[in-house]
């Protein structure tokens, strides 16, 4: 099913709900009276979202320090395991690679996901656990914890930790123990970056493609769903004095990454205030995947929006309807670069807790975004945005442990909680 078809199905599923902000192609034809009017309409939302985005951005110096730290891990492996330096390549994955890494509202450390790609010798091909354990031996002397697919490396007195995933080029282990070619699982266009990682639970190699996922998000982010004429007019006025965007700072016109960041922040604030259970919160890769699918789908359907908050509301309205459930597989959120990988695998083993939490959070998210959208003036828009996303008057980038002036902890007034159900329909 294409992204457009997924979005159309989501529209149909929520058709009985309240009217959407921008739900007809005809809306695209409404003429704006002038650039001044366009700028006036867009500017307050652009300012408010830019303020929030800057507040949740992690300081560039902390990102630089973390990047140096994972390169040091690679050097440690070369030294301890006597692997050729040219055989190891380390690069970020997850939020750090998609530029959607954000600071935590509760002063906890931020995590950097890094992939350690190693060109292995033949002895490791049939012994993935030995490869994984040897990487662990190479990290001896550090504070490490073995997880299912990575080594968690903690750094005392630093605002981050690193989840270090050993991997190999898929080409080197592409035939599994049953004689199946793992390369057939890789989506067309992403084979060059495909990897195999160790799955300790099954004691096998599993296909992965973090760089492919980054490429997929990058391609989607090029679509502009907020009307171009408004965006250009507003940005010329709002962004004149903004300094060049660094690695983890994104401009307000990058509406896909802004959406991912803000939705992740809202999820974190919902956990922080106790509105949803941390154990069952939607994981970041699910939010990235669903939002990017919707973004592609809306672009393919020709949807455009008058301002960024309207786009966010539309995404929030569609979000709970983007997770299909099948009689055979249960809930399924597929990796767009690796066929068969289900990011929602744990949704099918928790008696509906994650699906139920997701549905509840989506309702809270939509309510809060509509609260911002309903504001009548710039001051109120900013105040509501600050409250929803837990921002203080300190709006600059900060460290992952909260930094700055902390966060607002007074909970936003909420609608009545949704009734308990068996999960998403």
Which residue ranges define each predicted feature?
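Terminal (often C-terminal) interaction modules
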Residues: 2-50, 313-425
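Conserved catalytic core of two-metal-ion nucleotidyltransferases
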Residues: 77, 81, 98, 129-208
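Short helix-terminating capping/connector loops at secondary-structure junctions
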Residues: 83-87, 145-146, 278-280
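Histidine-centered divalent-metal-coordination microenvironment in nucleic-acid enzymes
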Residues: 97-117, 154-165, 290
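Long, charge-rich alpha-helical interaction segments
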Residues: 193-257, 262
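Conserved nucleotidyltransferase catalytic core and NTase-mimicking acidic/glycine-rich helix/loop elements
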Residues: 241-367, 371
């Amino acid at each position: 099913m294409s992204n457009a078809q997924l979005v159309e199905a989501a529209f149909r599923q929520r058709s009985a709900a309240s009217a959407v902000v921008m739900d007809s192609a005809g809306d695209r034809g409404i003429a704006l009276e002038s650039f001044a009017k366009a700028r006036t309409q867009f500017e307050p939302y652009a300012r408010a979202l830019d303020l929030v985005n800057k507040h949740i951005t992690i300081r560039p110096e902390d990102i630089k320090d973390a990047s140096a730290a994972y390169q040091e891990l690679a050097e440690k492996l070369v030294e301890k395991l006597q692997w050729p330096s040219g055989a190891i390549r380390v690069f970020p994955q997850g939020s750090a690679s998609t530029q959607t890494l954000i600071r935590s509202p509760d002063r906890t450390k931020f995590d950097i996901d890094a992939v350690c790609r190693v060109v292995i010798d033949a002895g490791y091909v049939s012994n993935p656990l030995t490869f994984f354990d040897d990487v662990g031996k190479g990290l001896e002397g550090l504070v490490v914890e073995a997880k299912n697919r990575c080594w968690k490396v903690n750094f005392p007195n630093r605002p981050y930790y690193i989840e270090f995933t050993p991997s190999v080029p898929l080409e080197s282990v592409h035939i599994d123990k049953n004689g199946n070619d793992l390369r057939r699982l890789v989506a067309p266009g992403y084979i060059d970056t495909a990897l195999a990682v160790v799955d300790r639970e099954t004691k096998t190699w599993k296909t992965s493609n973090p760089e492919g996922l980054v490429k997929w998000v990058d391609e989607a982010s090029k679509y502009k769903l907020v009307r171009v004429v408004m965006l250009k007019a507003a940005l010329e006025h709002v962004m004149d004095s903004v300094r060049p965007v660094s690695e983890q700072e994104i401009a307000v016109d990058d509406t896909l990454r802004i959406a991912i960041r803000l939705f992740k922040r809202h999820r974190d604030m919902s956990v922080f205030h106790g509105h949803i259970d941390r154990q069952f919160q939607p994981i970041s890769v699910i939010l990235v995947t669903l939002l990017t699918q919707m973004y592609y789908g809306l672009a393919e359907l020709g949807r455009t929006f008058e301002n960024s908050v309207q786009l966010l509301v539309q995404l929030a309205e569609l979000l709970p309807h983007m997770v299909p459930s099948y009689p055979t597989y249960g809930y399924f959120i597929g990796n767009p670069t690796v066929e068969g990988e289900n990011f929602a695998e744990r949704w099918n083993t928790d008696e509906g807790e994650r699906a139920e939490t997701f549905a509840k959070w989506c309702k809270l998210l939509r309510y809060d975004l509509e609260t911002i959208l309903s504001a009548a003036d710039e001051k109120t828009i900013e105040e509501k945005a600050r409250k929803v996303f837990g921002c203080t008057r300190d709006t600059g980038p900060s460290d992952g442990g909260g930094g700055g002036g902390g966060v607002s902890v007074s909970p936003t007034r909420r609608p009545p909680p949704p009734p308990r159900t068996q999960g998403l329909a």
